[in-house]
């Protein structure tokens, strides 16, 4: 069975929707690959290989599970919406406002 890109995106959102309820942040699907993203704080960014819309994060930490989520990273800057592939963290968008708990 082969799903179209839009059907796959709708399926991903329907499966992830209940888990996103009540989060103080919002991360859309990745702009380059339509993966689910979560907030990461990174010390820096370099252009991702073969992409015009994404960046590879440098020394990143996942802050999605922080009890008191804040929009400021420990070393300054703001969290970015990213996904991980192996040891790499790929970021494509800014973190948006979610639903407060």
Swiss-Prot record:
Cysteine disulfide partners in this protein: 27-81, 41-73, 42-60, 82-91
Domain of life the protein comes from: Eukaryota
Keywords: Conidiation, Disulfide bond, Secreted, Signal, Sporulation
Claim: Cell cycle is one of the keywords in the record: no
Induction behaviour: Expressed after 12 to 24 hours post induction of asexual development, which correlates with the development of metulae and phialides. Expressed in vegetative hyphae.
Cellular localization per UniProt: Secreted; Spore wall
Signal sequence residues: 1-21
Function: Aerial growth, conidiation, and dispersal of filamentous fungi in the environment rely upon a capability of their secreting small amphipathic proteins called hydrophobins (HPBs) with low sequence identity. Class I can self-assemble into an outermost layer of rodlet bundles on aerial cell surfaces, conferring cellular hydrophobicity that supports fungal growth, development and dispersal; whereas Class II form highly ordered films at water-air interfaces through intermolecular interactions but contribute nothing to the rodlet structure.
Subunit comment: Self-assembles to form functional amyloid fibrils called rodlets. Self-assembly into fibrillar rodlets occurs spontaneously at hydrophobic:hydrophilic interfaces and the rodlets further associate laterally to form amphipathic monolayers.
Protein name: Unclassified hydrophobin dewD
Biological source species: Emericella nidulans (strain FGSC A4 / ATCC 38163 / CBS 112.46 / NRRL 194 / M139) (Aspergillus nidulans)
């Amino acid at each position: 069975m082969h799903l179209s890109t839009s059907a796959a995106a709708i399926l991903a959102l329907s499966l992830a929707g209940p888990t996103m309820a009540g989060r103080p942040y919002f991360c859309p699907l990745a702009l380059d690959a339509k993966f689910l993203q979560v907030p990461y704080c990174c010390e820096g960014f370099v252009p991702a290989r073969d992409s015009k819309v994404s960046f590879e994060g440098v020394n990143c930490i996942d802050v999605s599970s922080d009890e008191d989520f804040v929009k400021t990273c420990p070393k300054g800057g703001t969290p970015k919406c990213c996904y991980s592939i192996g040891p790499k963290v790929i970021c494509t968008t800014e973190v948006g406002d979610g639903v407060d708990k």
